[in-house]
């Protein structure tokens, strides 16, 4: 009897073990990265690299509906992937529509780039963004900091754009009701 229980115990313990569920919010980024890994990019230190970096800086320095319409398809490759922590998009057309909607809901959107670093074909842009939203805190500037990972194609267009920033501080803390709850949660940590 005891021997039978000893044999049964490991089986019972194994049956009771659960595998934790992993909610992988990074999977779309990893999928986009994998499909854009072997794409020929820019030569480090080249004029094409310098121009691609300047195009990106100009695009985000003072976004308007007109500038977005004129520049998005020069800045982003047709098959580009973008995730700004608020939304994930594929394709320059979808990215253009998203940025147009963004600037329509804002009084102004400007970014100042403080640093750019390159490693293995990945470019990291450290920035400060000032946003004045029409409906959230009208008339007030919301300043946030972040880093954007960019991978360029051979024409200097963005293939991959992944933002790393605190979207709760940049947007959600300013939504009536929601902002109070988020600030309360943050205060408990």
Predicted regions and their residues:
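Beta-strand elements of well-folded, non-transmembrane domains
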Residues: 131-135, 150-154
